[in-house]
Amino acid sequence: MRFKEVGLLFCQLLAVLIFAAGFFPQKKVLKGDAQFQYMAETQRALEPAFDKLVLVVIDALRADFLFQQNVSHFDFVHELLNRGEAWGFTAYSNPPTVTLPRLKGITTGSAPNFLDAILNVAEDDSSSNLKDQDSWISQFAKHGKKIHFFGDDTWLKLFPEEFFQKHDGTNSFFVSDFEEVDTNVTRHLPHELQHKDWDVLILHYLGLDHIGHKGGAASQFMPPKHREMDAVIRQIYDQVDNRTLLCVMGDHGMNDLGNHGGSSAGETSAGMVFISKMLSSYPRPAAQDGVSSPVTAAEDYQFFTRIQQVDFVPTIASLFNIPIPKNSLGVFVREFSSLLGQHATTKIIENYHQLMQLAAKKTAARGNDDIDSMLAEMKDVQATLARTATNYNYAMLFLGVGMLSIVTAATAYCYISSARLNEASVLMIAVTALLGSSVFGSSFVEEEHQIWWWIIIAVVGYSWATRPSCTPSHLVFLVCARLLRGWNNSGQKFMYDFTVAELLKSHPSIKWLLVCATLAVVALDGFTERPLLSIFNLLAGLLCFVYKTCWANVNGEVSPTYAQTLVTKACSLLFAGGTPWDDKQLLVPLARLFFKVTAAIVCMRIAYNVVFAKRKFLSELFPLFTIVLIMQTASQNIPLFLVFTIMRSSLRNILRVGYPQQRCEMFFVLSLILQNLSFFQFGGTNSIATIDLTNSYNGISENYNIYVVGLLMCIGNMAPAIYWSLAAVVDHQLYSKKSYAQQKLSSMFFYSVNSLLLLVACICMRYHLFIWSVFSPKLCYLLGWNILIHFLTETVLEPFLLMVAG
């Protein structure tokens, strides 16, 4: 690419990054540890309601997993609820519903920072550390309490190790494991419960969350995991006294696909239950009184009393008689006032003073009879503070917008002045204008897939009407597009039970036949011209199929007999040595072998091309790249690459016959449309809840590497977009008379204009109700598309391949 285009691209990326740095700043927080404010001497002399705290965090424990009939298998918890020794709540978790910001909320009571959702996956990030921020953890440590911690090592990223007298962290992102990751926590229990040399015991279990990511909320592995966690709760309950409070909670919930990060009811409704033998001596919460557990299904997962998750913080602080953390937005849970007796009013007034100080409001003297109005006012202040929790850096916002405005103007000038006025350029300008204007509506952002669907239908319909000679190809393309449309659920507002992907899950024989057919068709593409390379591709395809079958077996999916036989024979040849390996042991070596074989084939083909330059270099490598993308794709989506192959063939025929003078220009524009359409129809959305981690660990052992996992995650989630981007550059090499930089101007124009308009929309909507659940994730996706597709794929990888091709 020419220096001018590269310079514009770097300036565009820099402008968006500057804007993001101003839009997602670290929040300003009150430093230091809190002290009692109201009747301080009296409070310091009070006895706590409990002596010890056991906190069991079950990652992604949705409220229905804990309370709902036919869903929950926490039988012992239900028994305790019915005896009054457990009080249940549905705790609302503010989005983004990922672990790191939710743990911040649970421990400090503060509102989440959306940047934490991004930092959540950065293993070596230290910017989220809470060493200098007040929390009930730091308060317990300051008061000389001994804290033992076992589980998700996110806690060790948040808090200094000196806060914990004993700790053992487990990696939270190796989602392929949902057994050992919990066993490593539970193995500490016998010793901890026997010696009880702690005041606070924190256990954070990850297995349930991993099961959700792997198989969804209704996975066959969910009931056994519920029972396992229920047994842990029973084990703790049986060995602690009535002066110990056991709290079981989810840090967030999950949607039906098993993902989280967004703002749907399932993701924000976490279960929470307080357990103690002492509780049966006090009146139950009104919502629980006379109700038998497990309960029937509730609308939007609202079971028993609904509280804010941050309300846990002042409640725990009050029950254990420590100051409420300075930055807490929580409001004391009124149901626990009976445990504090005559001092309940003192604690509520203390909470009132703390919250008003955080809101910078003056507090007037209050009488004991004003408790109800005080709690109501606190709830109002809580809601206001939660909405205005972020301090935007306006200098960086406007610098980013100003810089991007200049870049966009320059890019638009270069594109419009160099482009011929034809159907391809008009279509690109129309698509850019339509998408750019749509970002100002939250519903358009949530349902963006609808826009791309109607764009492709309109374009193909227009082409069919004006070029009827290509009727068969148009018809085939439309049939494939409709099949693509119905393959998965897309968007965030509506879910459908009968999708092609769900049907394939329930008919595994058909699914695996289609997987075989897809790999065979892709691998043997061009067999008559390059039989040797096709055989190598077939070897890579075979390794991919064997790995996918093993993965399915390990994760409880059904695979047909012929697939099992193939796996057995292939593995006996590949891993001979006398020691039989089970499918789980084979996963990592199989994936690594696949990537090594693929890399060897690519290197061999590049070396061959250096000696014998061939114009079809990229088209010969394209099937192998497609197999790599298939490797990073969920099995039910793999047949879509067969659909893509048919669509690509039809599209090339339409352009060859109907658009001979603008073939490559039109393919570039249609490639951009199909990148976005196929991304959404693969199940993607503009919510971080649909980021799929399933294939992020192919070939990764327990030695978690953020960079490798991040790369695999990006390839897996952007596989369809990468496919269509590479398809466009293959056609460019074969047929284009223009330079790649000239062709690339069209996509640069699209990305620049849409980036600018989204940044403007984010400024306009910064106090909108959906700023964190809709516009902020969209901004994150904009960064992802710009970096992964626009920069790494189209500006780094594709020009490199064209250079090698000569």
UniProtKB/Swiss-Prot annotation:
Its main location: endoplasmic reticulum. One of its GO terms (biological process) is GPI anchor biosynthetic process. Glycans are attached at N70, N184, N242, N488. Keywords: Endoplasmic reticulum, Glycoprotein, GPI-anchor biosynthesis, Membrane, Transferase, Transmembrane, Transmembrane helix. GO terms for cellular component: endoplasmic reticulum membrane; plasma membrane. Disulfide bonds: none annotated. SUPFAM superfamilies: Alkaline phosphatase-like. Its EC number is 2.-.-.-. It is a multi-pass membrane protein. It is found in: Endoplasmic reticulum membrane. The chain crosses the membrane at residues 396-416, 425-445, 451-471, 508-528, 532-552, 593-613, 624-644, 664-684, 706-726, 745-765, 782-804. Pfam families: Phosphodiest, PIGO_PIGG. Pathway: Glycolipid biosynthesis; glycosylphosphatidylinositol-anchor biosynthesis. One of its GO terms (molecular function) is CP2 mannose-ethanolamine phosphotransferase activity. Ethanolamine phosphate transferase involved in glycosylphosphatidylinositol-anchor biosynthesis. Transfers ethanolamine phosphate to the GPI second mannose. Belongs to the PIGG/PIGN/PIGO family. PIGG subfamily. This is GPI ethanolamine phosphate transferase 2. It comes from Eremothecium gossypii (strain ATCC 10895 / CBS 109.51 / FGSC 9923 / NRRL Y-1056). The gene is LAS21.
